């Protein structure tokens, strides 16, 4: 227990939490915090010793700097801590919590009074359970609470109160007879029980901008304390697209109508007035706004604040409507839409099956009501929402490491594309499987285990196509740490250390978003109006331009893709920062901007361009092509040629076997891939109707 001669008593304010003010942090002497820092750093070093891992000098310096920043943080501020994946980010959080948990055994402890409490946000349920146990075991009493709803992990541990569900899809939720007493379904009741609150990212999204509603807790005597420290493991989603279309507006009106019963006269009148004003000040202006939307420059267009106001979205009536909505019910869709309309400076339109407008913005994490917030992210320097955000302080990255053992292979070639849409086209998936097989054949002598990552939709089909290589490929590991018969997929690797034995990573596709998502992010980051001015100038020029292809938007795409690749490659043995094993990463048609971002991030890594695809990939693409549900002429021809036993045949024999007419046969012979096949694999003798084709045997090839 740390002694302190004089401690200023914490103010406790009862009543409405919105009226409470945070007490400034630095209320203990520097010597007390320095002692705490030494204990935390000792814990970090002990963790490395227990795991028999080496801690690089610059790595330990970076962790020490991060500890200092956390302990001396100020409420209302937000800091991003750039620690490379596998560099001790989770270890640092564990060391902090273990040391602070001991202090929270008694709120008379000066450190406990100083911090009041902590909120911790993690990605995986298993991590939350581990931290909860660590805190409570270290303190010898309950000082930490994990607040989470039912999920696969906790149900697999037998946390269902009546034992009927062992997986999330078996949980009855509101239909369960024990719903009202289930600690998982009623987890929000436990938000204010202990000084340390642990939650998952999904729940944190609900409180991100209203953190004051969960920043306090009460002890058994109903003494209230304020949690003044927030630790976030990995970058949360900070973007809000603010989408509005007729479907969303109708859904919001329906919610208002169904929220309260209409058989009470007063409620019915209140409801009718609300829906009338909703239609007048929101729905009708939206219909008018659609008339000024242009598609001259592609499916996306820019709308300025003047356009929105001219259509009828007036500040005064919207503010009046917001007050009435708040008086009617809190947290309605209608209230959120009105709030978005009041705070937007510019928006953009998207024309697809429906006409939508988007009012993007960055969520606000700073402010006097917010605790001192620290975002621990291994890709912070590749995240524009952190680096370009004036309200977030990015700590200096003092990490020094050579990445000379890392090599990126950029596969080029027009036959296969890296997008999910292309994967769905006939023959494309087979071509991808051929390409992966080709890469594995080249790499298997150098690498014992290979990690192939693709889109979730194709993870199982590709796994089945790659059956001959199952002994070298790593399967997908689910949330319960069990292997599944599919490839790992984008979005399914968060928080997993199950792929560390891989020394080669193959990215089967690039995890691109929709173009509107990158445009949304660019405008959300446009606090000073630079990007908006750039778009306006482009729209006023005589040269047509698509908004989603503007340089500023493409830059956001490049950084987003590069960030995903960095996180992915660190799932391999590159995560062992003290290691020397060569690491190879194969990328399929990456944009040059992505490669530049990777070069800046990894410094002295290596890049190799592969200019062309193997012949098997090109042929697989061609043989799988369909037109109106039927094989193309080239597909029919190539399929027959690949299955040909090589015996001498005449053109007439081929036409009869494939069902091609004489003109069709002549046409398909001019196809580049068919020509290439004949040049490489076929020997021609005779001429005219005496022409004979023979398949060249392997020796002759």
Residue ranges and their predicted role:
Residues 2-701:
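ASCE RecA-like P-loop NTPase motor cores
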